[in-house]
A protein has these predicted regions:
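Glycine-rich helix-loop "coupling/hinge" segments at transmembrane-helix boundaries
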Residues: 102, 113-117, 145, 186, ...
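Short coil/turn motifs that cap or connect alpha-helices
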Residues: 78, 88-89, 163-164, 187
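Hydrophobic alpha-helical segments of membrane proteins
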Residues: 66, 70, 74, 78, ...
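Alpha-helical transmembrane segments
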Residues: 14, 134, 138, 187, ...
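Gly/Trp-centered helix-boundary motif
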Residues: 1-77, 81-82, 89, 107, ...
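Conserved glycine-rich helix-kink/hinge and helix-boundary motifs of the Major Facilitator Superfamily
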Residues: 96, 168-169
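Generic hydrophobic transmembrane alpha-helix motif, especially the helices
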Residues: 40, 44, 50, 71-76, ...
């Protein structure tokens, strides 16, 4: 429920935010105001309403997370399915490639590419996080496909003359969807944290666009840890609640998947 509300908030951010996310509220009289009835989350050093920026930041952060995870799941599923179904030397080559890529720490790889590719932007960040996040999914899918292709039902369908493409699309991949959904949902929380870290370091979402990471960075900059605590605290709470909600959804999906796999009595 919390995750659904956050998604709705992100989708309607421009209409729900009480003020323009980028506009100041008056440089002279609204700078670094503490939380009040007019500005429930206070304002920052540029006289921007923090509540509005947190709401707009949810749209950016969640969009990056969901779209990059969707991209990673799609690439990983196709790669792992091809490797697992065809097998042989191609499977070995593809999996050794994945092993080599997994040996590179993802965060360091993303930081290096984002730093070299200055001004990566929101779209570039989605591609970057998506194309560095499919390795684990491909291994999971490959293992599931190897198991599924040996099922008696799949063997029978193959004996009836069904093509490999049809077998893979209609009889093997449907068995993979649920575990991939769990893995992808778990990745959402990780990607949100990675994006926030990149934006905090200045190599992710650039100002004046708002993401939770760069709002926190803005609040902690110039020694403002205690003097303007509201600027970093509220986006930090939003980040924590979102990651917690994602993890709870993952636990629910795992329990549902485990219940489906239990033998009938």
């Amino acid at each position: 429920m919390v995750l659904v509300l956050l998604a709705l908030l992100a989708a309607t951010a421009p209409f729900v935010a009480p003020y323009d996310c980028l506009a100041s509220q008056g440089i002279l009289n609204a700078k670094n105001l503490s939380p009040s009835l007019d500005y429930p989350f206070g304002t920052d050093q540029f006289s921007r309403d923090v509540l509005s920026r947190v709401i707009c930041g949810s749209r950016v952060s969640l969009s990056i997370a969901f779209l990059s995870v969707l991209l990673a799941a799609a690439v990983g599923t196709v790669f792992g399915a091809v490797a697992g179904y065809l097998g042989g030397w191609l499977d070995a080559l593809m999996m050794r490639t994945v092993d080599a890529l997994l040996a590179i720490p993802r965060v360091l790889l993303v930081i290096a590419v984002a730093t070299l590719w200055d001004g990566v932007g929101i779209a570039g960040l989605i591609w970057l996080l998506g194309l560095t996040g499919w390795f684990g999914v491909s291994r999971l899918v490959r293992a599931l496909v190897v198991s599924a292709r040996e099922d008696e039902f799949v063997t029978a369908v193959r004996g009836l003359g069904a093509s490999d493409t049809r077998i893979l699309a209609y009889h093997v991949l449907p068995q993979v969807i649920a575990p991939v959904l769990v893995a992808a949902t778990l990745s959402v929380g990780n990607v949100i944290v990675i994006e926030a870290g990149l934006s905090y370091l200045g190599v992710g979402v650039k100002m004046p666009d708002a993401s939770w990471g760069n709002i926190i960075s803005n609040g902690l900059g110039d020694g403002n840890f205690t003097s303007t605590w509201w600027v970093w605290l509220f986006p930090g709470i939003a980040l924590m609640v979102t990651v917690l909600a994602v993890n709870l959804v993952v636990d629910g999906l795992r329990q549902a998947l485990s219940a489906r796999q239990l033998p009938a009595r």
